[in-house]
Amino acid sequence: MKGGKMDKLKPIIAIISLQFGYAGMYIITMVSFKHGMNHWILATYRHVVATIVIAPFALILERKIRPKMTWPLFLRILALGFLEPLLDQNLYYIGMKATSATYSSAFVNALPAITFIMAVIFRIETVNLKKTRSLAKVIGTAITVGGAMVMTLYKGPAIELFKTAHSSLHGGSSGTSSETTDQNWVTGTLAVMGSITTWAGFFILQSFTLKKYPAELSLVMWICAMGTVLNTIASLIMVRDVSAWKVGMDSGTLAAVYSGVVCSGMAYYIQSIVIRERGPVFTTSFSPMCMIITAFLGVLVLAEKIHLGSIIGAIFIVFGLYSVVWGKAKDEVISVEEKIGMQELPITNTSTKVEGGGITSEVNEGVTNNTQV
């Protein structure tokens, strides 16, 4: 029983761990942008690092189980590299620069809802509002997104949970938010919305691709390699300054290495496994937790204050996530019960014998013997 419970907890622990990784990436990436890092170059180096890290494991560990590459598979992998490494990441970076990190991160929390809608359209998820489990997934998704929006749109009074010695150093940081009012919010909003939509599409296409190419490490290697090629081409077109490619011991290099190893290599692999086992909706349902983790890391590391809106939103997110996970768990229970029921159906072997002037039908494994004279 312990092993069974642990198997159910592993995907949850893995996805929650990824949220810590993403929170760290947001902080490091913002620092690198402030020091002049170009987002096209960052996306390119990020996938160079990810490919180098993942390739040895994929080539060695999956050499016997790796499916043969075909043109349809190659085109799917090319589309995956186009959707997430190129479009999603660069659109998000553009949106974050045009608006603000807080504003753009709020839209990330729409990812579970968009993924759920796409999953229903492509019949990966089924919805029957007469069933409690389906209703729980729909309501839970709405509550999760709503809670994340509350954290962003309703600030409320500051609540100082931890008294820090560095509080006074960050007292003037609140004025920085006013700087974003002069920026192009329309362009930024459209860019972030496009980013989240392509990310959701990536999860859906990945779930289909895994059915044809069930070698997670190899798939991640191919996605990262495609991301490297596509981002390199885009960078050569969009970035004219050769010095932007310069690599040094700075925040830009740290951002590329960290995001490449943690948020591309490890994240793609973990997400592939969880998607195969629990589906794309379950995988994306935990993304709003990144905002909560970032808020608490901000308190501990940057001596920031948590506001009432953040606490209220966090409570909503927890309830929403519980509702979605409960609905998915019920789906799995129903699926297992149906499989067991199919296996337990009686198999009847009917033999027919001709005896004299009549026909005798005998059911060996069943309950009845019928004789026709």
From Swiss-Prot:
Record protein name field: WAT1-related protein At4g08300
SUPFAM superfamilies, per the entry: Multidrug resistance efflux transporter EmrE
Family of the protein in this entry: Belongs to the drug/metabolite transporter (DMT) superfamily. Plant drug/metabolite exporter (P-DME) (TC 2.A.7.4) family.
A UniProt-annotated Pfam family: EamA
Subcellular location(s) of the protein: Membrane
Keyword Membrane: yes
Major location category of this protein: membrane
Keyword match Mitochondrion: no
InterPro entries referenced in this protein's UniProt entry, alphabetically: EamA_dom, WAT1-related
Domain EamA, first and last residues per copy: 23-151, 198-325
Segments traversing the membrane: 11-31, 41-61, 67-87, 102-122, 139-159, 185-205, 219-239, 255-275, 281-301, 306-326
Keywords, in A-Z order: Membrane, Repeat, Transmembrane, Transmembrane helix
One term of GO molecular function: transmembrane transporter activity
Natural source organism: Arabidopsis thaliana (Mouse-ear cress)
Gene Ontology cellular-component annotations: membrane
Membrane-related topology note: Multi-pass membrane protein
